[in-house]
Every structure is written in structure tokens, then in C-alpha cells.
Amino acid sequence: VEVEDAQYCAVVASGLLACTIPFLAFASAHSHVLVADTVYGPTRRFCDRTLKRLGVEIDYFDPLAGAGVDKLIRPNTHLIFLESPGSMTFEISDAPAIAAAARAKNVVTVLDNTWSGGVFHKPLALGIDVSVQANTKYASGGADVINGSILTNREDLISRMKETITDLGINVAPDDAYLVLRGLRSIETRMARHQSSGLEVARWLKQRPEVQRVLHPALEDDPGH
């Protein structure tokens, strides 16, 4: 099953590791990274606790900035990290515009693609350099493994990230890799049902007087639709 249409993939021991490895591979003391304001909470905590302590400069940006992210890029910006849909608030970022702005200044882009399971959203096809996801969520399918994946079509980037993985000694156990491969056999069927069921619940909630707002990008009146 092809879920991300990527040429290269590295598997790590958790989804959070998949998110943090690109930072460790491409950022260093005195370098600058841009992080979307709505990324996964533990990813943001890693930036605030660990990266800042290592001397990395971090700015959080509006996930709806689109091409406007160009104005935030500095000469020492090495990485732009975003999540789309945004974690918990589900904004849809203009990934192609962000990728184009970054590419023009030789900045690596990384997108946390966990919410789509790699099925509904193809970041690499939109120009993003690296797509990461927590296989723990959807790819495994059995709630019996903690795992993450890092995907790209660039050999230079995967080589750098694999070096970081090796240096930190965080290679994944073979049994865990097997469990994810098992789950991928049914991911398209499962994600289709997740999507239809979730949308049905979202539409029901919109009719409820107790609910002020429903955050779901598949709703026709959602800004990210």
C-alpha cells in the first residue's frame, strides 16, 4: 500500500521522534526555525524545552500565513515545521505556498501528516520536503504499537536524518515494524470509515443548540474546506 508516495522512509520508535528528528538533523546552535502555532503539543514542548536550551532560535507563525511565511524567513532559517490540519484546531495550511517560499531560500520544510494517516493528504506531492507521522495513530490499526515514520523524496535529507537516528540509537524494533506493515494492509478501508463516521458526527453536532462551533475541514462552511 502506498500511503505517502515517498521514495525514502525511515521508521522510528514513536511519532514524537518522527517529529523531532528533523529538528535535530537540520537545526543547530544559532540557527533559526519556524514552527506553526498549532503543531502537536509535545512537539512544541520539545522546541521550548530542548531546542531553545541547545541555542536554536524558534518563532511560531500563523498556520494560515501561506506565502506570507516568506517575510519570516531569516538568513539563518534552516527549517519550517507545520501540521495540517492543525492539531486540535484543524486549520488547513497552504502547504504549496509555504513550500515554494521555503524552497526559494533553500529552507527545509517538514509537515506532520498524522491526521490524514498518509491517505487523505500527500504533502510531498504539494512540494513539502519531509512528511512525518505517528504510525501509532492510524497506520498500525491495532492500538498495539508505538511507532513513527519519516518520509521524503530527497536522498540528501533522508541520509542526514538516518545519521541522526543512528547517532541517538533509536532504531525501531523489527516486531514493531511488522505490526505497522500489517496495519497498512487495511489503512485505506479504515480511514474511509473514519472519515465518513467523523463527518456524520460533525454534521450532527452542527445541528445541536449546545454547540457553538464544529472544527472539521470537511464541512462545507469550514474555512479549510
Model regions: which residues?
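Conserved PLP-enzyme active-site core in the AAT-like
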Residues: 8-207, 215, 220-221
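Contiguous C-terminal substrate-recognition/catalytic subdomains in enzyme active sites
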Residues: 223-225
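Portal/gating segments that form or line small-molecule/metal binding sites
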Residues: 5
